[in-house]
Amino acid sequence: MALRRVFLASAGLLVFLSSATSGSSQEFRPWLASHLENGQRIYMSGVTAQGRVVQNSHGMEGVGCAMCHGPDGRGGTMHGIPVPNITVPFLTDPRGNEHNGRKRPAYNEETIKAAIVAGIDSGGNALHPEMPRWTGLTARDLDDLIGFLKTLGAVRRGSPDMSQGL
């Protein structure tokens, strides 16, 4: 448990330091460790730190983003459906990305929120119908979830496939 707290605190510090050096208004804000813990619980289980099940368009209970996108956010394939990488460096790549043959621009915090809650990508297109619309998130829970997503990208930033063009 103590190791997990050290990891989360270190990840939060890394996110803070990396965002503090940027002058872009579209950069992501750093988030506190307690908020990261709530975001992690939502991501992993679909349940808030207060024990509230987050409602979604598929009526799933006790499952979160990790069920499809994986614990590291890198996606893959689930039941034959391609599941995209949702790490922040991938989503915010200024070159955009192509998924399912459709190119989209880079995401920012607001477009990530739209993807999570409304199922709309950064180009204004509907996401795959299998992507649940997480309608039961409070504004704080949504910010906490995005804060946790930032740690997934921060931890992976040095990996070989992420080093190109960042």
Language model regions located:
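Electrostatic cytochrome c docking/interface patches
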Residues: 23-61, 101
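Gly/Gly-Pro-rich "capping" loops immediately C-terminal to redox-active cysteine motifs
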Residues: 53-111, 130-137
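Bacterial N-terminal signal peptides that target proteins for export
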Residues: 1-10
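Detector for the c-type heme attachment site
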Residues: 44-47, 67-75, 117, 121, ...
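Short loop/beta submotifs within extracellular cysteine-rich repeat domains
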Residues: 49-51, 76, 92-95, 122-124, ...
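Bacterial N-terminal signal peptides
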Residues: 9-18
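Extracytosolic ligand-binding ectodomains
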Residues: 158-166
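C-terminal capping alpha-helices of c-type cytochrome domains
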Residues: 38, 107-122, 129-159
